From Swiss-Prot:
Keywords: ATP-binding, Cell membrane, Membrane, Nucleotide-binding, Translocase, Transport. Its EC number is 7.-.-.-. InterPro entries: AAA+_ATPase, ABC_transporter-like_ATP-bd, ABC_transporter-like_CS, ABC_transpr_CbiO/EcfA_su, Co_trans_ATP-bd, ECF_ABC_transporter_ATP-bd, P-loop_NTPase. One of its GO terms (cellular component) is ATP-binding cassette (ABC) transporter complex. Probably part of an ABC transporter complex. Responsible for energy coupling to the transport system. This is Putative ABC transporter ATP-binding protein SCO3161. One of its GO terms (biological process) is cobalt ion transport. It comes from Streptomyces coelicolor (strain ATCC BAA-471 / A3(2) / M145). Transmembrane segments: none annotated. GO terms for molecular function: ATP binding; ATP hydrolysis activity; ATPase-coupled transmembrane transporter activity.
Amino acid sequence: MTGPAAAPVPDAPASLDVSGLAFAYPDGHQALFGVDFCVARGERVALLGPNGAGKTTLVLHLNGILTGGTGTVTVAGLPVDKRNMAEIRRRVGIVFQDPDDQLFMPTVREDVAFGPAAAGVKGAELEACVDRALTLVGMAEFKDRPPHHLSFGQRRRVAVATVLAMEPEILVLDEPSSNLDPASRRELADILRSLDVTVLMVTHDLPYALELCPRALILSDGAIAADGPTAALLSDDDLMRAHRLELPFGFDPRSVRASG
């Protein structure tokens, strides 16, 4: 799973296809209103939007944590439904904002091994799987360390490794740059660029989205309000204002060479 980021493969099934997805919570709050989008294999796509737009609700549908709405979600051609749930949860790896939500074992190695071991991987194959995932995120030398002895940035990289160990079709990242110092932020960006995996990145960090994702979706009031090149969307002042998105003071997306 190393090497340059894969180019989209036009003849392969889309990594992610969301069609007509609508969802209301039991209290009657309608969070999603007919969401439609498709992510090709190998794409890196940012999911942007203000608080309350429905981003978390959408993400929780991608691997079946939330169900019961209308519309469909498919991952590499496989519908997200009860029959396919085990395989869907292998194919869709979600890295949560707080790595401590994913790291709960005594050592880094045990955390990364947990998913594959639960899926029946054993022995030398399991060790190779752990080593491969930790190498991808530059954390192989820390595999015998307790996670709570690591820095926040290192724990986030280990959290990514726990997902990569399952060899997912798509990596979903929730606010990956939050609480990272500049060096850790840069290191994580380099890692994400190197992965041969489809990426959907949920973030309020618009410069990071521009740096890593050639394409962006804006989710606003439970619907896709815009879908296009990240640089173009961030340069559209009217669009940004309409959906309560703000760039850092002095940051001009037109002056930045976006990630390819």
